[in-house]
Amino acid sequence: MSEKTFLVEIGTEELPPKALRSLAESFAANFTAELDNAGLAHGTVQWFAAPRRLALKVANLAEAQPDREIEKRGPAIAQAFDAEGKPSKAAEGWARGCGITVDQAERLTTDKGEWLLYRAHVKGESTEALLPNMVATSLAKLPIPKLMRWGASDVHFVRPVHTVTLLLGDKVIPATILGIQSDRVIRGHRFMGEPEFTIDNADQYPEILRERGKVIADYEERKAKIKADAEEAARKIGGNADLSESLLEEVASLVEWPVVLTAKFEEKFLAVPAEALVYTMKGDQKYFPVYANDGKLLPNFIFVANIESKDPQQIISGNEKVVRPRLADAEFFFNTDRKKRLEDNLPRLQTVLFQQQLGTLRDKTDRIQALAGWIAEQIGADVNHATRAGLLSKCDLMTNMVFEFTDTQGVMGMHYARHDGEAEDVAVALNEQYQPRFAGDDLPSNPVACALAIADKMDTLAGIFGIGQHPKGDKDPFALRRAALGVLRIIVEKNLNLDLQTLTEEAVRLYGDKLTNANVVDDVIDFMLGRFRAWYQDEGYTVDTIQAVLARRPTRPADFDARMKAVSHFRTLEAAAALAAANKRVSNILAKSDEVLSDRVNASTLKEPEEIKLAMQVVVLRDKLEPYFAEGRYQDALVELAELREPVDAFFDKVMVMVDDKELRLNRLTMLEKLRELFLRVADISLLQ
């Protein structure tokens, strides 16, 4: 069977840059699935994406589905005919479904009996006939949150469509996709190359688009070119470009023919905190900032034009003129804000609502101040500095700079606090209170910052859960999942001696009578333990290991982490599987018994050597392991408990627990309960699979 290259290109208006990669990757994944489901043999499916096009190129696509031999077994002969040999309704219905009559069916004989059988040779459908629907289906499944309609048509897509190119080899596949009749016309760059041209063969793509249309359709190639050219441009001025992945992706999605240029701004603007300048360059203008080798911002930036100009200096000057007013604004705001102390913004916090039922930002500030001081006392941080940081924590939200450049919240608080002469750990805490902002982000660097970051997040968690507005489905407007995970990460990775129970109770107490949810403390803790489950699954821990620890509901995050590591290590021991099974057996035995057990085992009642030996070892280990549990040495404790495998196995092999002798039965049940309690000091080992 011959093979050909298939090309589909959808020419559109400018596509959303932040969604371009996901649209192209989904298009490729959807179409690959369509090919596989149709049984069409094919080679590599390569995707292309530029601001005004999505395209796929499929190598070695078979021209038709393979022919198939199908068999459909019908009713058994005994059920297919009545006593007179007439076909039953079941046989006739089956035959109708196969498109034949009963007398046309074959018979299949096996050692288990005889059945009606339908065999057929199904010729594979041509690829040409299948492709239009496959393309349409793949496009319909794209992850587009908001569709748009254009003109008088009822067609919906992410952006208006102008061209649809469908080529199988050198042949146009006739189809109407998204309201456009397919042909071999492709549009080039808006301002360079040929605005429109025809493509003779799918194999010519994307080279023909580069040569005649001045468009680099390969997304990864454009991105790599921008990165390499920007690095070289920065090197030429003795610096390093800030090529953050997210901005690099966005810029690659904005240009069809990237031309990297270097511009500059006035050095006087370097007196403004670098974060504000960078926010303007990256966020507003999509420029790449440039840093010196010592990490200081240089008065230069790198940008990407979408055109080759005969006079690039004109483009450079234009961009310099555009950015200058923005930098001047930042300079003005910075100088204006510093004319008063950060603390002077406190009264204005009373004018901003945190949440309708929970009060203003000033109310939140008072709670954070108190909670940060309480946390600082628990973890050995400077209480005065923590409460000071809490008092100032939201003041920068009232500054001109943060009002204009919202992403500078926190960092501007740090700069203004330093200007006011606040303690360094207080200033740093104002910046780091929002950390970690995302998975893998840095944690607060000092104890005061940790106290403030935890206080801010716990106040939000307690308040929102306290009025019954916990996250539902994908909706989490107050970012409570991120807040909970942030608290857990700080406590675990900084090894802080904090208990979620008392921490949550204190956060709730500070709200006074504002909260309406009577179960708020338990709800917050359960929610945070649920975040633990997700965290440890991402870390590669098995679900049953997590469940074994969660069953004990440890509310000290550092303690939870120690238990997780201990159970994970325990699973590597030879005795683990047997002891997990034994714990499950003990758990089941105890669950079925409703008898009241004694507080201790009566040694004089024990009879069998196996139970005497096990009872003695349980007593010895109970005393030996008490300091282990007190110190959180759970891994060492489980290693010691692994030594119980042999006596536990011997006990269950030789000793009957549920005997008629009540005193003996209760004594044995008590011993098993004491055995299980030892393991439960760490986790519920019976849940391990």
Curated annotation (Swiss-Prot):
Domain of life: Bacteria
UniProt-listed GO biological process terms: arginyl-tRNA aminoacylation; glycyl-tRNA aminoacylation
Protein's UniProt keywords contain ATP-binding: yes
Cellular localisation: Cytoplasm
Gene Ontology CC annotations of this record: cytosol
GO molecular function: arginine-tRNA ligase activity; ATP binding; glycine-tRNA ligase activity
Enzyme class: ligase
Main location: cytoplasm
EC number: 6.1.1.14
Keywords tagged on the record: Aminoacyl-tRNA synthetase, ATP-binding, Cytoplasm, Ligase, Nucleotide-binding, Protein biosynthesis
InterPro entries reported in the protein's UniProt record: DALR_anticod-bd, Gly-tRNA-synth_bsu, Gly-tRNA-synth_heterodimer
Catalytic activity of the protein: tRNA(Gly) + glycine + ATP = glycyl-tRNA(Gly) + AMP + diphosphate
UniProt similarity note: Belongs to the class-II aminoacyl-tRNA synthetase family.
NCBIfam families documented for this protein: glyS (TIGR00211)
Name used for this protein in its record: Glycine--tRNA ligase beta subunit
